[in-house]
Amino acid sequence: MLDITYVRQNLAEIESMLQNRQLASEKPRLRQLLEYDKNRRELVQRSDEMKAQRNKVSKEIADIKRTGQGSGEELIRQMKEVSDEITMMDATLSKLASDIEEILLSLPNRLHESVPTGKCAEDNVICKAPVPYLHLLDFPIKNHLELGRSLGILDFERGAKISGAGFPVYIGKGARLERALINFMLDYHTDHHGFTEVFPPFFVNQESLRGTGQWPKFADQVYHIEEDNLYAIPTAEVPVTNLHRNEMIDAERLPVSYVAYSACFRREAGSYGKDTRGFLRVHQFNKVEMVKFTRPEESYQELEKILMSAEAILQALMIPYRVLLLCSGDISANATKCYDIEVWSPAEEKYLEASSCSNFEDYQARRMNIRFKADSRSKPEFVHTLNGSGLATSRLMVSLLEHYQNRDGSITIPEALRPYTGFTSIDQLTS
């Protein structure tokens, strides 16, 4: 959430940000916000004056009663009128505060100066050229669906029977491979990159979703359990970032770095017409997430570290990938700067998003009231929060299966995963 003072003092920047994000339609709400803010500040001043007058009259009434000079009835009548007006003002102020917060919660974050201006995904900038790991595929290539079926390791049909479309079932060595990927990534981030592992709840309350920015803007994308008023998490970012909600973090601990595995649940409302085959778009998937809390002056340096940590996984697995810097029209509403890592699918002949690494500056921390003090004499400041997928297994599995397939239809397990799988290949089923 943006600071209302910052919005008021940097109106031209905020309007430009909305324009660059292709959200010019939000400008009337911005003007409404400033009108609410102006009315609130004027009313606060008037309310303070009235309260000062009430205190003055109360003292005069007390003096009259103490000295016995008159009944003070007129002053009592005046004080009642003032008190009634203050009560009405307080109610109006409460409504204005609610209206201001509602608009602030819906406004997107500011953009970092390095974010390229663009309208859509086609305008994203390739900031790291494709990193090729040559796997000789000089035979007809099968896609991950064909491989999963022929090897007996993936079953989307039974998943649909159990839960509906978008809920895959991993079987046998497929289940072992999925678990191996998760454990490998967790170990890599904790052992090589200094992250502390967290195993968070998979269901959160509305306040947690609001803290990270998924609520109310993306309310239609989350699964809701009405009886308990809990929500299935769309990403481990939500519970892990909320670990420090309403807390003051010791400055000496910063940056705080967490990594967490979770299942992720997304309704994917509005995905009609998009490619939903296999793992390309699912309602439930597994992901390892990195989350950082940093000092403001260190957050962009830490963003680069998160990106390198995610890249290191693909380098260890020898999966071809590229890195994009998202443009202003494609970046998420909460982020000031975001990199996407895309893995290559030989069968689809295109890149698939497998990770997003984002800096939110104080946008989430302000919502969640997460602060630190640089030293004992300093005023509390909001931390900066960052996160990055490290990685999502679904699209990673697509690229892995397709790249490591062999002419006979078997899959060779990448060397980095073999200590976790306990096997070196997945062979064709025999009838």
UniProtKB/Swiss-Prot annotation:
Its EC number is 6.1.1.11. The keyword Disulfide bond does not apply. SUPFAM superfamilies: Class II aaRS and biotin synthetases, tRNA-binding arm. GO terms for molecular function: ATP binding; serine-tRNA ligase activity. It is an enzyme of class 6 (ligase). InterPro entries: aa-tRNA-synt_IIb (IPR002314), aa-tRNA-synth_II (IPR006195), aa-tRNA-synth_II/BPL/LPL (IPR045864), Ser-tRNA-ligase_type_1 (IPR002317), Ser-tRNA-synth_1_N (IPR015866), SerRS_1_N_sf (IPR042103), SerRS_core (IPR033729), tRNA-bd_arm (IPR010978). It is found in: Cytoplasm. It comes from the Bacteria. PROSITE patterns: AA_TRNA_LIGASE_II. Gene3D superfamilies: Bira Bifunctional Protein, Domain 2, Serine-tRNA synthetase, tRNA binding domain. It catalyses: tRNA(Ser) + L-serine + ATP = L-seryl-tRNA(Ser) + AMP + diphosphate + H(+); tRNA(Sec) + L-serine + ATP = L-seryl-tRNA(Sec) + AMP + diphosphate + H(+). Pathway: Aminoacyl-tRNA biosynthesis; selenocysteinyl-tRNA(Sec) biosynthesis; L-seryl-tRNA(Sec) from L-serine and tRNA(Sec): step 1/1. GO terms for biological process: selenocysteine biosynthetic process; seryl-tRNA aminoacylation. Pfam families: Seryl_tRNA_N, tRNA-synt_2b. GO terms for cellular component: cytoplasm. ATP binds at R266, R267, E268, V282, E353, A354, S355, S356. L-serine binds at T235, A236, E237, E289, S389. Homodimer. The tRNA molecule binds across the dimer. PANTHER family: SERINE--TRNA LIGASE, SERYL-TRNA SYNTHETASE. Belongs to the class-II aminoacyl-tRNA synthetase family. Type-1 seryl-tRNA synthetase subfamily. Catalyzes the attachment of serine to tRNA(Ser). Is also able to aminoacylate tRNA(Sec) with serine, to form the misacylated tRNA L-seryl-tRNA(Sec), which will be further converted into selenocysteinyl-tRNA(Sec). This is Serine--tRNA ligase. It comes from Chlorobium phaeobacteroides (strain DSM 266 / SMG 266 / 2430).
